[in-house]
Amino acid sequence: MLRCQHNAWIHLGLTIVAIGAGFFFGLSSREWCWIILAIAIVWTAEALNTAFEFLADAASPEFHPLVRDAKDVAAGAVLITAIAATIIAAIVFWPHVAELLKWSNGVLE
């Protein structure tokens, strides 16, 4: 996937950031479960999207509007999972970030 999908590199970078932040903030087991689930869902969607694109290209090497539309729908599924993962990350990390800000400079006191 990383060889052919530009967005996979973005997902990889954000995966590394999420895992690093998890270690930095000392997430609980329950929080880790949510983060790992979110990461796994995004990577699964990206893998399925990539496989679908390969199959569509093999079935119809020339341009066809229905193939384009099908690829757009598959890419949209990845976007939906990425948005859901972002929401999960915000819910998990916000209390930790808020506590860090409160502790470091009194912003949230």
Range-by-range predicted roles:
Residues V67:
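Histidine-centered, metal-coordinating catalytic motifs and their short helical/loop contexts
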Residues E53, A70:
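Residue-level signal for inorganic ion chemistry
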Residues L2-L48, A59, F63, K71, ...:
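Hydrophobic alpha-helical transmembrane segments
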